[in-house]
């Protein structure tokens, strides 16, 4: 059987067009063995291979090579599917660049919003003597169809009512196979969008007619025209959605926390109110200490495992001991009545129940075909996770450095530990059992959402816990001697220290970022969109030394620190002896320590003379200070502790840990005592180099860093990619996000324009997600009460109201703010549930402070917010739901 590949491509001098495919004749998928195509003139390239008649379907790609440089197509490959009775195939392809409407190719649209039911799939199979047309048209709505109309009777003579409809089985690619003899050797054609039922024309393709010509038609040849893109008028789509953590959901079936199956009620409500997205916080297992500290969803013990608290126990099974079951039922009712999540009691009860249930039915579950398939597909992460969980329980700590012979992960040792003959097997298999049921329940929700045309949007944390399975199994992928965080911002004046180790991107790059790809592909089993938490981390991360506590002592990594010579060239008189160590002056001590000043001097400081002091060896790092005062929470000790931490922040430059002798200006260095000690000329010089360092110097450098990583990761799944790009944003970030078509995040109270207090919603980019607030902020009602002067300006300048602003955010004001956000050009408007409810004075919570999910400035915050009304109640609120539906519809969403 003969297959001829043909493609038009205009090459430059020295370039060659290559063909790489899964067959032996095309290099078996190895790019280094790709074949060189023949140039037949006029930019037409071709290549013919002989293959067995029994060949199976295969994928292939085109490449352009010039020396060592390679230009590749978009990540979606071409696919050859053998047909019927054809002895020769002509594949007339088009080069595939990344489409301009990339978000519509994501599974958020193909499997969710524009999901098309296919009770009996009919994949396109070419046959001898036919021409098959394949075209990408991802923006067609579920009630629309694509027709092929043309200049010959077989194509309806330009009459849509007589034209043939394309098949959407492989949506967003459409296909149609026609008899070549009826088409003739040459004709013109276009594609037309119509309503499926009425055949009412929605849109014709724009531009000149397409032309097909075959000078040598053959009854034994199957021709496939592929790679076409629908060239229609722009049809903007805007959607709305709700953001809420799973643990915050409340239903009548709950066990004191939200569960995966509760999301089906939220899907129903989204459908009822014209919403298409449900955005969640991370749902991975965070069990490390067994305390409420594990409520923090961004500190997972595994980037793959799901959290056991999200299981609906009644769907897993009921205990055979009726008295014991009755005790759990009573506890469930008690916990479900609580206003907030009691994390410790809920998780303790659920794990106790699951242990009992596992004893009763675990063997049957683990011997089922469904579980065996799940285990085969997930063993690479499931077995290490289950072993980690067993060892954590056994040693009473997640700090694997305290696990004796298991402190360093050894694959063969863990295989023995998990073997069925191991005395620890049952403790390991318990976690197999739990993860399998979590998989079943979340998969059920995903399928339910797909059928409803609703998208589940997940969240990818930027960091991993330093006491996690990932750090235990793959320590070489992380910089374990560092901590990730964020520089100071509106949320935290001392910056944020998340405690996570940072990524060693150089090591990760060696295997093509395999760990990241596996993580994202696993996530795509349950979600069709995701939010990259702190997308700036892919450009650079705020890295803090392990012996520091405050984010103020961090620096960017990767970065280009300054040498003393470069500082001198910029006119700055650098002196490491006092500019890189805490600069403590006598006159500041009393302001900080008050009546305890003399005691602090005696116990913790060293007099250097000339009014300067050093911290003694007991207190020369922030980690030592925190450890020393651990457990001391009286007023005096807290004041002294915080004062000493403040003194340690008083440095003007920080030495780079990887490049000794090179330095970073300390963030907000102009607020230090060392800066105040400079003369005016040196202050001005520092200000100039500071601005250049933080806002200009690294733009191209960080852009290159991001483009090494993000394209590979974005292309690894079909999920819609959104980025959290708030905070200190270098100019390269929006540029790269636009290039990769990653949706940005827009919030009116956090504008990205300089010298602007409130964002202009009408100027938000189309490729963005807009919202009123996030889980790290107060809701719009809480924000309204935080700063009366700012609120007054918003009331007058943004809302255009005159007079005094109300002291509280009244429902009509909330409605105005919600409508303003909905009016933005942003593709998505995803609001917290609390802000949707704020427009109704009867339904919203009385105290807006009780709606807070997280306070970033508090490093040990208890994440326990729950809805104050149940989802069943919300679904029954017909008047409110209709009002919300109409509000969203009026906004064009």
Map each language-model feature to its residues.
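Boundary detector for helix-to-coil junctions that initiate low-complexity/charged tails
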Residues: 91-101
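Residues in well-ordered beta-strands of folded domains
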Residues: 6, 20, 38, 63, ...
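Catalytic cores of glycan-processing enzymes that make or break glycosidic bonds
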Residues: 101-132, 179, 211-893
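Short secondary-structure junction motifs
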Residues: 14, 57, 143, 186, ...
């Amino acid at each position: 059987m003969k297959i001829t590949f043909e493609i038009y491509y205009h090459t430059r001098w020295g370039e060659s067009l290559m063909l790489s495919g899964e067959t032996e004749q095309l290099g078996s998928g190895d790019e280094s063995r790709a074949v060189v195509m023949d140039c037949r003139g006029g930019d037409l390239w071709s290549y013919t291979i002989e293959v067995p008649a029994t060949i199976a379907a295969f994928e292939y790609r085109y490449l352009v090579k010039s020396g060592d440089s390679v230009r590749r197509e978009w990540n979606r490959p071409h696919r050859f599917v053998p047909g019927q009775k054809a002895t020769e195939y002509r594949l007339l392809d088009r080069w595939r660049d990344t489409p301009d409407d990339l978000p519509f190719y994501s599974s958020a649209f193909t499997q969710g919003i524009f999901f098309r039911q296919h009770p009996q799939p009919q994949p396109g199979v070419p046959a001898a003597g036919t021409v098959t047309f394949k075209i990408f048209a991802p923006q067609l709505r579920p009630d629309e169809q694509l027709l092929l109309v043309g200049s010959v009777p077989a194509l309806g003579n330009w009459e849509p009512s007589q034209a043939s409809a394309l098949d959407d089985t492989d949506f967003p690619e459409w296909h149609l196979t026609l008899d070549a003899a009826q088409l003739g050797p040459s004709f013109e054609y276009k594609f037309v969008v119509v309503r499926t039922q009425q055949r009412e024309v929605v849109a014709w393709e724009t531009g000149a007619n397409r032309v097909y010509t075959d000078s040598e038609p053959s009854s034994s040849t199957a021709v496939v025209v592929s790679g076409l893109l629908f060239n229609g008028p722009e049809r903007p789509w805007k959607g709305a959605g709700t953001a809420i953590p799973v643990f915050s959901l409340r239903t009548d079936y709950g066990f004191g926390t939200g569960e995966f199956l509760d999301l089906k009620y939220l899907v129903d409500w989204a459908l009822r109110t014209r919403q298409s997205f449900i955005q969640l916080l991370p749902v991975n297992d965070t069990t490390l200490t067994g305390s409420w500290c594990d409520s923090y969803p961004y500190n997972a013990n595994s980037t793959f495992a799901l959290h056991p608290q999200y299981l609906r126990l009644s769907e897993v099974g009921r205990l055979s001991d009726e008295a014991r079951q009755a005790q759990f039922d009573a506890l469930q009712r008690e916990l479900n009545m609580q206003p907030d999540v009691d994390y410790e009691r809920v998780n303790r009860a659920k794990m106790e129940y699951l242990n009992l249930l596992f004893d009763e039915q675990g063997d049957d579950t683990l011997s089922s075909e469904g579980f065996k398939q799940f285990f085969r597909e997930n063993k690479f992460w499931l077995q290490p996770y289950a072993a980690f969980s067993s060892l954590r329980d056994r040693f009473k700590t997640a700090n694997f450095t305290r696990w004796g012979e298991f402190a360093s992960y050894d694959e063969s040792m863990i295989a023995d530990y998990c073997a069925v003959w191991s005395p620890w097997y049952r403790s390991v298999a318990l976690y197999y059992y739990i993860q399998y049921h979590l998989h079943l329940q979340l998969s059920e929700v995903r399928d339910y959402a797909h059928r409803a045309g609703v998208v589940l949007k997940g969240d990818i944390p930027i960091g991993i816990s330093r006491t996690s399975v990932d750090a235990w199994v793959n320590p070489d992928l992380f910089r374990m001697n560092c901590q990730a965080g964020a520089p100071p911002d509106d949320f935290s004046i001392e910056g944020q220290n998340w405690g996570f180790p940072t990524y060693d991107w150089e090591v990760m790059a060696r295997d093509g970022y395999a760990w990241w790809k596996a993580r994202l592909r696993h996530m795509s089993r349950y979600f069709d969109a995701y939010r990259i938490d702190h997308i700036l981390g892919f450009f650079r991360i705020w890295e803090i030394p392990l012996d520091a506590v405050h984010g103020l002592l961090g620096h960017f990594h990767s970065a280009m620190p300054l040498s003393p010579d470069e500082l001198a060239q910029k006119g700055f008189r650098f002196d490491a002896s006092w500019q890189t160590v805490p600069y403590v002056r006598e006159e500041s001590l009393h302001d900080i320590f008050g009546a305890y000043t003399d005691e602090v001097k005696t116990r913790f400081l060293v007099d250097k003379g000339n009014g300067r002091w050093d911290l003694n060896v007991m207190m020369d790092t922030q980690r030592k200070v925190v450890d020393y005062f651990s457990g001391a929470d009286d007023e005096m000790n807290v004041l002294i502790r915080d004062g000493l931490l403040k003194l340690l922040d008083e440095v003007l430059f920080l030495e780079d840990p990887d490049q000794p002798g090179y330095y970073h200006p300390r963030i907000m260095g102009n607020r230090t005592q060392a800066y105040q000690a400079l003369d005016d000329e040196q202050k001005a010089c520092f200000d100039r180099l500071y601005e250049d360092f933080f806002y200009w110097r690294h733009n191209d450098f960080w852009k290159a860093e991001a483009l090494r990583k993000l394209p590979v990761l974005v292309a690894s799944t079909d999920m819609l990619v959104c980025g959290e790009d708030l905070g200190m944003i270098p100019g390269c970030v929006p540029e790269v996000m636009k290039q990769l078509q990653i949706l940005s995040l827009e919030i009116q109270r956090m504008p990205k324009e300089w010298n602007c207090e409130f964002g202009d919603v009408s100027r938000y980019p189309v490729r963005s997600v807009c919202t009123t607030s996030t889980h790290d902020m107060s809701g719009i009602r809480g924000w309204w009460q935080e700063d009366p002067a700012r609120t007054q300006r918003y009331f007058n300048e943004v809302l255009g109201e005159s007079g005094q602003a109300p002291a509280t955010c009244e429902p009509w004001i909330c409605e105005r703010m919600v409508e303003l956000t909905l009016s933005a050009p942003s593709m998505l408007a995803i609001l917290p549930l609390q802000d949707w409810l704020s427009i109704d004075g009867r339904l919203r919570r009385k105290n807006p402070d009780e709606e807070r999910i997280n306070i970033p400035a508090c490093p040990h915050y208890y994440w326990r917010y729950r809805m104050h009304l149940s989802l069943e109640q919300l679904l029954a609120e017909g008047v409110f739901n209709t009002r919300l539906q109409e509000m969203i519809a009026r906004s064009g969403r």
